[in-house]
């Protein structure tokens, strides 16, 4: 991964925080290259400040500033959250950590040609010891998939 690859989290709950902690602990990303947004601004600011991560006011700000966008919201929120940023996501690597939201559903809610993969991580990723189960079906290029595998 490039030292300046920027990673954004849309949703910054427990799993997103665990992933961010793992990225930071493995030096896979610098804190100033990680962006996050969440529904509760005050809680987001507390959680990003202690990590040195940049808080964003909304999904659009997060997506615009990121090369890789991690969708870390509940499955029932996914269509609403992505509806406002799908044109921005088209030029990004999109990773979902929402269990039960498969490739086919993303094909319905994202613009055609958006590069995305669905994963299921576990919380030991916070110390760089967890696993990411990746759905076999995805729309990443070989180099994008290699980048995702390298990061996680």
Sequence positions of predicted segments:
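Internal alpha-helical scaffold of NAD(P)-dependent oxidoreductase catalytic cores
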Residues: 105-115, 131-152
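Short, glycine/charged-enriched secondary-structure capping and boundary segments
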Residues: 23-24, 49-52, 83-87, 108-113, ...
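Hydrophobic/aromatic beta-strand patches that form the interior of the parallel beta-sheet core
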Residues: 35, 56, 95, 117-119
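A general structural signal for well-ordered alpha-helical segments in protein cores
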Residues: 12, 16, 44, 66, ...
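Hydrophobic packing within well-folded, soluble alpha/beta domains
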Residues: 7-9, 69, 95, 148
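NAD(P)+-binding Rossmann beta1-loop-alpha1 motif at the extreme N-terminus of oxidoreductases
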Residues: 1-57, 64
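Rossmann-fold NAD(P) dinucleotide-binding segment
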Residues: 54-110
């Amino acid at each position: 991964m490039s030292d300046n690859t920027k990673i954004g989290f849309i949703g910054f709950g427990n799993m997103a925080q665990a992933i961010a902690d793992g990225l930071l602990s493995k030096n896979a990303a610098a804190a100033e290259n990680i962006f996050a947004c969440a529904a509760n601004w005050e809680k987001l600011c507390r959680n990003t400040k202690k990590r040195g991560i940049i808080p964003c006011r909304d999904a659009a700000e997060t997506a615009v500033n990121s090369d890789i966008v991690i969708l870390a919201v509940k499955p029932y929120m996914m269509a609403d959250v992505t509806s406002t940023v799908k044109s921005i996501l088209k030029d990004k690597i999109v990773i979902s950590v929402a269990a039960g939201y498969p490739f086919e559903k993303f094909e319905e809610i994202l613009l055609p040609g958006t590069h995305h993969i669905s994963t299921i991580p576990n919380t030991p990723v916070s110390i760089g010891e967890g696993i990411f189960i990746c759905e076999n079906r995805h729309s990443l290029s070989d180099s994008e998939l290699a980048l995702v595998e390298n990061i996680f």
